[in-house]
Structure formats: structure tokens, C-alpha cells
């Protein structure tokens, strides 16, 4: 099993030291997120300070960027870090697209499917596999003169993964992507009852092999060196569970456990401005559904029980502002947990 963590994004001057330390600690990859900061710039800095570790956008907001822009960014990163770049894309929700990024909204699953196909068409052109002639419902790319073709890569373009929660997006991930980035708002039951069957249908449609498809995430991790540290992280997870449970897009996960009323109640509370009270609605039993909880000395067994057999990689940090601090020997213990993924198809 791979173990990923995050790097500070608020100050690019901190990235080289942080990235080097993460690599030295034995992590498999470092991720950036698109919250308060841009996700590609820190990876460019990290590429110059590391030799082995994967560089992952987890995730970049797709529809706010043309596929051509992402194709260029991914290509240049892969040139600096050959074979180490994974472009993770996500649709975000309607409100953020329309009101935060000022981009039009449409059904996200078919649009993101087309987006990934457009990315691959651009990269195929740059690899000399024919002229650029992509014509879809949302994107058209038909112009590429030699002046705009970047220098060849020494290997394949980046792997492409997408964030997915619902069945339609999970099927898209399985059909056209190299992997899926599961939301931490996820339970083992949802992994078994929804994620695996929908991905399998996508693999069938796309003719893809499970062992060449990476499943990342699928739950929170609340850990620390002692019980007090674990308890502090549990409270952080409790609020995050409440936050996501208040959003209708995530209610299919609640439905797996008959918790639809909880989602509706939390949604009303947020609309009424009661953000400071939402965590009170999340019981310890509900936290346990969404998180692997345990001290460092318990974590290998806890993560194996929660994720093994489905997830190929786990996210050890909870946010870019809180990088993981797992002991290096624990990172290696987690990496020994068996996983189905053997490598991206190239």
C-alpha cells in the first residue's frame, strides 16, 4: 500500500525542504490540494528537490481550466520529474464552479470524461501520433502548429486520475482514467457496496485491468503518538464529517447506513448559520464509520482493516496545513500492507 502526504502550499519557499524531508521519511507521494492555493506551482518546486517521490495534484479543479492548460502543466512537470507525475482532477460542485470560478455548469460526469479524453488527445498529438482533432460536446481542439508543441518527454505523459463519489463518476474513472481519488467522506460499506461494483463496470467498458488502476483514499485517518493526540484528531474528523454530511452531493454515502435524516438536519443547520454546532450531531459511532482511528502503535492493523482489499494508497495527512508526522518505521509498516495495484499502464 502506498502512503501519501501533503506539503505546505502557503509559501513556495518552504517546499524544497518539506519535499526532501517527505521523501527521506519514506512516503510514496506528496499531494497538493486546490483550496486556498494553486496546486501545480508547489509540485514544480518539489520536482527540483526530489528524485523518487510521486508528485500528485489531489485535486486540481478541472472545469476552471482548459484541458490545454492542464496538458501543458502536466507535460512540463513530467519533463522535470519523469514518470513521477499524477494529475488528479475533480469537478467540484455547481456553486463553486458558477460562483467561485465563474464557469458554466453542466452534468459533471460526462463532461469530465470528455475532459480526460481531450487531455489524452492533446498528449497523443505532442507524441507524434497524428494531428490534433478532438471534437466533443464541451471541448474542441483542432489547432496545433509546431511552434506550440513542447519538447518530447523521455517517457509517457502523466497518469490521470479523477475524484469520484457517486456511481456515474466512479464509472467514468474506471473507464477512461488511470485511477480514482476517493473522497475521505467514505465508509467501508460504501467502498464495498458502491465503489467496487461501479469501478468494475467502468473497467469493463474501458477494457482496463484492475492491477493497472490505482484506488486512493476512501476515508479519514485519525492518529497520533498517544491517546490525547488521537482524541484531538478525532475532533477534527468529527467536524469534517459534519461539514461534508451537510452537502447533498455526499448523501449517497449516508444512504448506505440509513443516515439520510442526519444529512438533511445538518444541511438545515448550515443554511441557518449554525456551523459551530454541526459537529455535535456526529456521534463516535459515525466517526468510526468514516475514519481509521488509533495510536501509531495500532495504526497498521487499523488501516488494514479499514482500507485493505480496496484502497491501494492512503492519505496520511488531513490537510495541507497539517502534514503527516508518522514515524518512518510506521510508514514502512503501512507500505507492507498488500494492495492490488502494480503500476500504471504505459
Please give the residue ranges for each predicted region.
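Active-site-adjacent structural elements that line small-molecule/cofactor binding pockets in enzymes
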Residues: 1-346
Amino acid at each position: 500500500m502506498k502512503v501519501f502526504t501533503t506539503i505546505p502550499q502557503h509559501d513556495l519557499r518552504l517546499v524544497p525542504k518539506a519535499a526532501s524531508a517527505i521523501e527521506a521519511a519514506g512516503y510514496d507521494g506528496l499531494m497538493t490540494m486546490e483550496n486556498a492555493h494553486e496546486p501545480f506551482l508547489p509540485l514544480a518546486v518539489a520536482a527540483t528537490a526530489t528524485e523518487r517521490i510521486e508528485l500528485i495534484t489531489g485535486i486540481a479543479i478541472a472545469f476552471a481550466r482548459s484541458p490545454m492548460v492542464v496538458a501543458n502543466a502536466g507535460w512540463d512537470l513530467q519533463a522535470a520529474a519523469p514518470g513521477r507525475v499524477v494529475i488528479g482532477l475533480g469537478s467540484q460542485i455547481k456553486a463553486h464552479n458558477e460562483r467561485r470560478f465563474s464557469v458554466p455548469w453542466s452534468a459533471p460526469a460526462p463532461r469530465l470524461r470528455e475532459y480526460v479524453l481531450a487531455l489524452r488527445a492533446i498528449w497523443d498529438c505532442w507524441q507524434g501520433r497524428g494531428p490534433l482533432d478532438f471534437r466533443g460536446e464541451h471541448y474542441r481542439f483542432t489547432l496545433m502548429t509546431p511552434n506550440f508543441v513542447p519538447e518530447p518527454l523521455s517517457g509517457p505523459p502523466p497518469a490521470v486520475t479523477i475524484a469520484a463519489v457517486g456511481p456515474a463518476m466512479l464509472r467514468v474513472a474506471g473507464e477512461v482514467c488511470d485511477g480514482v481519488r476517493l473522497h475521505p467522506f467514505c465508509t467501508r460499506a460504501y467502498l464495498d457496496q458502491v465503489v467496487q461494483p461501479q469501478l468494475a463496470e467502468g473497467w469493463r467498458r474501458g477494457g482496463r485491468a484492475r492491477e493497472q488502476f490505482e484506488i486512493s483514499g476512501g476515508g479519514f485517518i485519525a492518529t497520533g503518538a498517544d491517546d490525547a493526540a488521537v482524541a484531538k484528531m478525532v475532533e477534527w474528523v468529527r467536524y469534517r464529517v459534519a461539514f461534508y454530511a451537510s452537502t447533498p452531493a455526499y448523501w449517497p454515502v449516508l444512504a448506505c447506513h440509513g443516515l439520510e435524516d442526519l444529512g438533511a438536519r445538518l444541511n438545515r443547520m448550515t443554511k441557518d448559520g449554525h456551523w459551530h454546532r454541526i459537529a455535535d450531531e456526529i456521534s463516535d459511532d459515525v466517526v468510526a464509520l468514516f475514519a481509521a482511528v488509533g495510536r501509531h502503535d495500532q495504526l497498521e492493523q487499523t488501516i488494514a482493516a479499514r482500507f485493505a482489499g480496496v484502497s491501494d494508497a492512503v492519505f496520511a495527512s488531513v490537510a495541507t496545513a497539517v502534514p503527516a508526522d508518522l514515524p518512518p518505521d510506521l510508514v514502512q509498516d503501512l507500505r507492507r500492507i498488500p494492495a492490488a495495484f502494480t503500476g500504471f499502464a504505459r
